[in-house]
From Swiss-Prot:
GO terms for molecular function: cardiolipin synthase activity. The keyword Iron-sulfur does not apply. It catalyses: 2 a 1,2-diacyl-sn-glycero-3-phospho-(1'-sn-glycerol) = a cardiolipin + glycerol. GO terms for cellular component: plasma membrane. This is Cardiolipin synthase A.
Length: 486
């Protein structure tokens, strides 16, 4: 009997080390970024069983077998749609500013579609303005409304949006609503899903959180886009979730959330529509390709509208597209670079690009919230400040709420606005969307918004920063080591 237990014990020890060795080899064979690989190996060696479970759950990009098959199956029809769209040569821009040209070339080569012109674009700088404009557009909708959001939380003006959407469905407008399962947990626990379905709205819970499937799909892969499409002509996107900040996370101690949204009219709605169609097919298996833009009702003269490129990321989309776009934008800067983000945990490549821009004389400013709703991200962000300050980057800490805007402005001409945070999750994992706008007029509007943020911020003093407590530095470095996992 003793021999039997001895054999069992040795088999368990052998299996234990074999499992660790197997996961280690798997991490090394994935050719992931070195900091990310090292962070995962550290977790596995310090807390082996927890680390292995965590890695298998969150360490690899598992979309799930069914969704992966749908993503693969949808591309032939999507490619045909893009090919047909490219035949409408009049909607595509052919002339770009010097600072924007490299980024638009990258997007064309990697996504197979160039920037579209003839769009009317409006910045909405407050949640009230956005929700009221959206309600008006929903009330005027005639054919179809598509929405996708990470968070939909009932309360305040959001309830008016819901009522307008249900009224639109009742009068015959085809309405689709896709919400992330984790982000919109309160919505799915409320009466609204049933009310909306009864009104005729197709409501989809995207990427359902299911602990029984934890090893079959990565649970922290989230649908992070915020998009509204109306009648294949009007489109919204930006940083705002479907929440009224007066009712959202009031107990978080960070103040009201500050967001920025863009409202567009024109052919860009079709290019955003194909992104929505892909998301819908991946989640439901149903194909809903949008119609091509109506070339008879759009102003195509370059002077009459904005040139916009849509960048989409996530499983099934070109890998590292958002990351490469940001790097290209930063390296294109010659005079000024202003970046706004609520969560600043950049990749090494992006950090070095930002510092290099400052070192070659570009005026670089980063605007982040002073208080953050994520303690881990707040400490991890602070770990990058010393290197940025040494390079000459100006860091502004916003003091009038949680600044949730995600924007980049390069030389007052090239603008990026969308859902992408400057952190690993947005850069490598989630379903995200970003607009690229080549227009100095829009750049001026965005600069005014950023100037307002700066006026409500405190400039971080490099000398004072060096005087922070020693224990702060220890905590910062600890979270810095795990920043590739955040």
């Amino acid at each position: 009997m003793t021999t039997f237990y001895t054999v069992i014990s040795w088999l368990m020890v052998f299996g234990y080390w074999l499992l660790i060795a197997g996961v280690t080899l798997r991490i090394l064979m994935k050719r992931r970024a070195v900091p990310s690989a090292m962070a995962w190996l550290l977790v596995i060696y310090i807390l082996p069983l927890f680390g292995i479970v965590a890695y298998l759950s969150f360490g690899e990009l598992h979309l799930g077998k069914r969704r992966a098959e749908r993503a693969k199956a949808m591309w032939p029809s999507t490619a045909r749609w893009l090919s047909e769209l490219k035949e409408s040569q009049r909607i595509f821009a052919t002339d770009y500013s010097e600072v924007a040209r490299p980024l638009f070339q990258l997007c064309d080569r990697r996504q197979g579609i160039d920037g579209v012109k003839g769009n009317q674009l409006q910045l909405l700088t407050t949640t009230d303005a956005t929700l009221k404009a959206l309600i008006r557009d929903i009330e005027l909708a005639r054919h179809n409304i598509e929405m996708v959001f990470y968070i939909w939380q009932p309360g305040g003006l959001v309830d008016q949006v819901a009522e307008s959407l249900m009224a639109a469905a009742r009068r015959g407008v085809h309405c689709r609503l896709m919400l992330d399962s984790a982000g919109s947990l309160q919505f799915f626990r409320s009466p609204y899903p049933g009310m909306m379905r009864n009104a005729g709205i197709e409501v989809v819970e995207a990427l359902k959180v299911n602990l029984f499937r934890v090893f079959l799909r990565r649970m922290d892969l989230r649908q992070h886009r915020k998009v509204v499409l109306i009648d294949n002509y009007i489109a919204y996107t930006g940083s705002m979730n479907m929440v009224d900040p007066r009712y959202f996370k009031q107990d978080a101690g960070v103040g009201q959330w500050i967001d920025l949204m863009a409202r567009m009219e024109g052919p860009v709605a079709s290019t955003m529509g194909i992104v929505y169609a892909c998301d819908w097919e991946i989640e439901t298996g149903k194909r809903i390709l949008p119609p091509p833009p109506d070339v008879n009702i759009m102003p195509f003269e370059q002077e009459s509208g904005h040139t916009i490129q849509v960048i989409a990321s996530g499983p099934g989309f070109p890998e590292e597209m958002i990351h490469q776009a940001l790097l290209t934008a930063v390296y294109s800067a010659r005079e000024q670079l202003i970046m706004t983000t609520p969560y600043f945990v950049p990749s090494d490549d992006l950090l070095h690009a930002i510092c290099t821009a400052a070192l070659r004389g570009v005026e670089v400013s980063i605007i982040v919230p002073r208080d953050n709703d994520s303690t881990m991200v707040r400490w991890a962000s602070r770990s990058f400040f010393s290197e940025l300050l040494e390079a000459g980057v100006r860091i502004y800490q916003f003091e009038d709420g949680l600044l949730h805007t995600k924007s980049v402005l390069v030389d007052g001409q090239l603008s990026l606005v969308g859902t992408v945070n400057l952190d690993m999750r947005s850069l490598w994992l989630n379903f995200e969307i970003t607009l690229v706008i080549d227009d100095d007029g829009f750049g001026s509007d965005l600069a005014c918004v950023q100037d307002d943020y700066i006026a409500r911020s405190q400039l971080l003093n490099a000398a004072e920063w060096q005087k922070r407590p020693f224990w702060h530095r220890i905590v910062e470095r600890l979270f810095y080591f795990f920043s590739p996992l955040l």
